[in-house]
Amino acid sequence: PIVCWSIEAFERNDRVSDIIVVVNERVSNMVNMLIDEAGYTKVRAVIPGGSERVDSTRSALDLLKQAGIPDGAKILIHDSVRPFVEQQSIDGCIDSLDQFNAATVAYASTDTILLTEDLGERKVVRSVPDRTNAFRAQTPQAFRFGTITKAYELATADPDFHPTDDTRVVVDYLPNEPVAIVAGSETNLKITTQADMPIAENIARSLDPEHAKQEAKARMHAVFAEAFSQMHKH
């Protein structure tokens, strides 16, 4: 399953000491079973997430705070639906926290990005940023524990708090805190729709060349079928 691919990426990294898995409560029993079967040694807890991403992050941060994690600890937050994250991205995040208090994996955009605004009932182009400075955010996103908890404390007090990811929380609420860019990759795909399936199958085959084409395709279809089945239950 997708979540296992993501866990394994961090499980096999010697620099990662502990893993917390945040999942929808509906599938927590299944995830616990998969973790037990795989024998992951770094998973310390499987906890229920919230209705939105930021709620899930806060649940994990609260658990870490209760455990007495020091402010200087390095924390990496990853989308479990990015199962093809590379070791160099994980290492890059960890290394970046030696110099910065926040970092994110990102991939240089090959598309022109348009910033828009409302004009009546239509969206119109407000500006076109230089593409050399445009990146697509990926994960992991990395923080010193004290930095991300402080950002969330400030954000929680804001009634207009609606960020899309954890880096955005730091950028918005700790504007003087630089966030370093760690080189990502095109294969660090976020699997969210059926349209992502053929791309994910190709990536899976490239990572597992010993498997035949049809075998890899069948495996990925089974994974996605289960994932989408769970999504439709929500």
Language-model-derived ranges and their functions:
Residues 31-32, 93, 200:
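Hydrophobic packing residues within well-ordered alpha-helices of enzyme cores
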Residues 51-119, 138:
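Conserved beta-loop-beta/alpha segment of the NTase-like Rossmann-fold superfamily
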